[in-house]
Amino acid sequence: LRATSIGACFALSAFDTPARALLLSPILNMESLILTMMDRAGVTEELLREQGEIAASFGQVLSWKYLCWVREHPVRSWTCPIHILYGSGDQMTPCRTVEAYARKHGAKLTVMEGGEHWFHTPAQLAALREWEERST
């Protein structure tokens, strides 16, 4: 299985253990990410529950149903080899979250210094290709 960002989150929530997993910039704690966005938008859980959906000033729509779904579908524990590529400048998932996940699940974590959540520069794409070759 190869998944990126929120795709990794959904894969970890939905799929049984694959033979191997390559996760690029994975969202490993969607609830925490949503709560951070709510805090940034000044939205409480009570307000979100009452209104159902709230458009935040930074372009995201916060959804009570989605927050509840995330809480009801936590990330599963896989027992396969897991390889993670993470950029040190990732703004979506804190480094401590990725490191804790890697320790708990025995994942091989590779951190690209200066990498971002979205690997898109020539240097980032080269690091991505190299990581894929080493991990498969």
Predicted features and spans:
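Short, catalytically relevant binding-site loops at active-site mouths
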Residues: 6-9, 28-30
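Conserved alpha/beta-hydrolase "nucleophile elbow" surrounding the catalytic nucleophile
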Residues: 2-8, 87
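Short glycine-enriched nucleophile-adjacent loop
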Residues: 8-21
